[in-house]
């Protein structure tokens, strides 16, 4: 059941918020506010080291000596947190690895940081998501 409430905003802040709504193609302010609240709760789950889901993406140099082995070894060290991986050959030199992860936020961050720190990793990103259990 949805509950209605009102908020007051400075004109400038409301203008910025309305621009955000237009850029993201929200149908209305309410859905945009719900989304912002959910995102805040997801961040809180990560800060509190709760069970979370995430996606680690890596772009790395295919030719870097022993890098693929190190990536695989580190994933095996965290095997209980890895749901799935996908490996894409982007071109002759670069690979993209996408790793779907779950578990305590601290463990997921440790894995993501470990992978990002490997020599030959050109770019890495951790998309922090919720399990969805607390977002009802």
Curated annotation (Swiss-Prot):
InterPro entries for the chain: Acetolactate_synth/TF_NikR_C (IPR027271), ACT-like_dom_sf (IPR045865), Arc_rbn_hlx_hlx (IPR013321), CopG (IPR002145), CopG/NikR_regulator (IPR050192), Ni_resp_reg_NikR (IPR022988), Ribbon_hlx_hlx (IPR010985), TF_NikR_Ni-bd_C (IPR014864)
Check the record and name the PANTHER family matching this protein: NICKEL-RESPONSIVE REGULATOR
Q: Which domain of life is it from?
A: Bacteria
Keyword check for Cell membrane:
no
Q: Where does Ni(2+) bind?
A: 76, 87, 89, 95
- Cofactor binding notes: Binds 1 nickel ion per subunit.
Query: Sorted alphabetically, which keywords does the UniProt record give?
Result: DNA-binding, Metal-binding, Nickel, Transcription, Transcription regulation
| Organism encoding this protein | Desulfotalea psychrophila (strain LSv54 / DSM 12343)
Q: Which residue windows are coiled coil?
A: none
What Pfam families does this protein's entry cite? Answer: NikR_C (PF08753), RHH_1 (PF01402)
Name the cofactor(s): Ni(2+)
**Matching Gene3D superfamilies, A to Z?**
ACT-like. Chain A, domain 2, Met repressor-like
The UniProt similarity line reads: Belongs to the transcriptional regulatory CopG/NikR family.
Q: Name one GO molecular function term.
A: nickel cation binding
* Keyword hit for Plastid: no
Biological process according to GO? response to nickel cation
Q: What does this protein do?
A: Transcriptional regulator.
Question: Which NCBIfam families is this protein grouped with?
Answer: PRK00630.1, PRK01002.1, PRK02967.1, PRK04460.1
Q: What is this protein called?
A: Putative nickel-responsive regulator
């Amino acid at each position: 059941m949805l509950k209605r409430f009102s908020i007051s905003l400075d004109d400038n802040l409301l203008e910025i918020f309305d621009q955000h709504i237009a850029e993201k193609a929200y149908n209305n302010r309410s859905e945009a506010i719900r989304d912002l609240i959910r995102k805040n709760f997801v961040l809180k789950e990560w800060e509190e080291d709760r069970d979370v889901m995430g996606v680690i993406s890596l772009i790395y140099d295919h030719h870097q000596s022993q890098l693929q082995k190190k990536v695989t070894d580190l994933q095996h060290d965290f095997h209980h947190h890895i749901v799935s991986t996908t490996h894409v050959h982007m071109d002759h030199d670069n690979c993209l690895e996408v790793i779907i992860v779950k578990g305590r936020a601290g463990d997921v961050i440790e894995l993501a940081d470990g992978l990002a720190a490997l020599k030959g990793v050109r770019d890495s990103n951790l998309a922090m998501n919720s399990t969805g259990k607390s977002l009802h």
